[in-house]
């Protein structure tokens, strides 16, 4: 196969991987953590993955501490945690 064909195949495989949903076995453990606003008083609209509802939901983040189940965009949340 030519190098151009290999590059095309590599690009298609990369795209396939990016578009394939995350399965529950591949989901990072932090996706199971509850929403955590943290102790600070900010009002940041962010998203977390809710494993009981199997979807990303919005919550208010205070701006400090909290946990890793905290995403700036719903797209990032879905890409990381949603099955």
Curated annotation (Swiss-Prot):
BPTI/Kunitz inhibitor domain location: 31-81
Name the cystine pairs: 31-81, 40-64, 56-77
Tell me the SMART domains matching this sequence.
KU (SM00131)
Give the InterPro entries listed for this entry.
Answer: Kunitz_BPTI, Kunitz_BPTI_sf, Prtase_inh_Kunz-CS, TFPI/VKTCI-like
KW Cell cycle (keyword) present: no
| Signal sequence range | 1-24
Q: Which domain of life is it from?
A: Eukaryota
Per the record, its GO cellular-component terms are: extracellular space
Q: Where is this site: Reactive bond for trypsin?
A: 41-42
Q: Which UniProt keywords apply?
A: Disulfide bond, Protease inhibitor, Secreted, Serine protease inhibitor, Signal
Question: Do you know which SUPFAM superfamilies this protein is assigned to?
Answer: BPTI-like
Read off the Pfam families from this record.
Answer: Kunitz_BPTI
Q: Name one GO molecular function term.
A: serine-type endopeptidase inhibitor activity
Enumerate the subcellular locations listed in this protein's record, separating them with semicolons. Secreted
Tissue specificity here reads: Expressed by the venom gland.
Q: Which family does it belong to?
A: Belongs to the venom Kunitz-type family.
Q: What does this protein do?
A: Serine protease inhibitor.
Q: What's this protein's name?
A: Kunitz-type serine protease inhibitor nigrescinin-2
User: Organism, per UniProt?
Assistant: Cryptophis nigrescens
């Amino acid at each position: 196969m030519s190098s151009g064909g290999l590059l095309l195949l590599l690009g298609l495989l990369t795209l396939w991987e990016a578009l394939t949903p995350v399965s529950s076995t591949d989901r990072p453990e932090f996706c199971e953590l509850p929403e955590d606003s943290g102790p600070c008083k900010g009002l940041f609209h962010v998203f977390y993955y809710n494993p009981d509802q199997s979807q990303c939901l919005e919550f208010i983040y205070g701006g400090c501490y909290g946990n890793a189940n905290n995403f700036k965009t719903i797209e990032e949340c879905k890409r990381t945690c949603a099955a």
